Swiss-Prot record:
SUPFAM superfamilies: Scorpion toxin-like
Highest taxon of source: Eukaryota
Subcellular location: Secreted
Cysteines engaged in disulfide bonds, as pairs: 11-58, 15-37, 23-42, 27-44
Taxonomic lineage: Eukaryota, Metazoa, Ecdysozoa, Arthropoda, Chelicerata
Domain LCN-type CS-alpha/beta: 1-59
Organism expressing this protein natively: Tityus discrepans
Secreted listed as a keyword: yes
Protein name: Toxin TdNa2
Keyword Disulfide bond assigned: yes
Free-text note on domains in this protein's UniProt record: Has the structural arrangement of an alpha-helix connected to antiparallel beta-sheets by disulfide bonds (CS-alpha/beta).
Length: 60
């Protein structure tokens, strides 16, 4: 699945100042194929279904 991964609160991880290499490492460490900084958060490609993803309920 292509999505924003979510942290334990269901929120998107912010990318530090547009760092696509940092996001790529985060995404691949979660089992995704790659990722980039879609500021202000990391967008991942090919995440496994077991990974939590952002569902627009952060801070609600």
């Amino acid at each position: 699945r292509d999505a924003y991964p979510a942290d334990w609160r269901g929120c998107k991880p912010s990318c530090p100042w547009g760092s696509s290499s940092w996001c790529n490492e985060e995404c691949t460490s979660l089992g995704g194929s790659s990722g980039y900084c879609a500021w202000p958060a990391c967008w991942c490609y090919g995440l496994p279904d077991s990974v939590r993803y952002y569902n627009n309920k952060c801070h609600k």
